[in-house]
Amino acid sequence: MKITKLEKKKRLYLMELDNGDKCYITEDTIVRFMLSRDKVISEEELKEIQDFAQFSYGKNLALYHLSFKARTEKEVREYLKKYDIDKNIVSQVIANLKEDKWINDGQYAYAIINANQLSGDKGPYVLTQKLAQKGISKSTIEEILNDFDFSEVAQRVANKLLKKYEGKLPARALQDKIIQNLTNKGFSYSDAKIAFDDLDSQVDQETTQELIFKELDKQYTKYARKYEGYELKQRLTQVLARKGYDFSDIASALREYL
């Protein structure tokens, strides 16, 4: 077979043969096989050219994808699938990129976790979930997590939450709110409790009284339309307890309020 045309088409070249066959190849393929118009090639050589062209095209696509930011192996595989590249060729591209250090799931996970240590607010459970979604193995994630202490991150998040809710909630509700937020962010209950216990979060009696009377004003308006006497008192006690107020504080406030 003889090459009758080599024509540049954007990123690729169109190669035509005298038997009517056509295929798109990369510039790297032309250089590697020293292709030119009128060059004679065999069936075996054509297969090699086509395979390498697919590999070269896939690698170029992957490198373009990686040029914006680091990616995991799973992310690169999914990107290449969009271009209908043969699965075997994709595996060859991935192996080549891993060998050249373009893809390293361990380094990717370490970078994400380390960045979280410096300025993030996620605990190990949420980080594990996010990294697993990107295709990183559980064993790799666990191995890297073992190198990090999340107590400082938990304390940093707890301090921010304290600033947000202090003076707005009674003591028990404040504790519940901060611990719940920490567990939602991926910290274990024990780590969240330790972080809360290390806070200077004393809610004084004056603040508690101010909060409970403010809440009473709102709830009394709501329940006094339907209830009175003992039942009204019970309804108000229940709703205030659900909001985190101690029963002794509730009883004291109701004696003054009603």
Curated annotation (Swiss-Prot):
Q: Does the keyword Cytoplasm apply?
A: yes
Q: Name one GO biological process term.
A: regulation of DNA repair
List the GO cellular component terms.
cytoplasm
The subcellular localization recorded is:
Cytoplasm
Keyword terms of this UniProt record:
Cytoplasm
Q: Which domain of life is it from?
A: Bacteria
List the InterPro entries hit by this protein, alphabetically.
RecX_HTH_1st, RecX_HTH_2nd, RecX_HTH_3rd, Regulatory_RecX, WH-like_DNA-bd_sf
Primary role: Modulates RecA activity.
What family is this? Belongs to the RecX family.
Its name, as the record gives it, is Regulatory protein RecX
Organism expressing this protein natively? Streptococcus pneumoniae serotype 19F (strain G54)
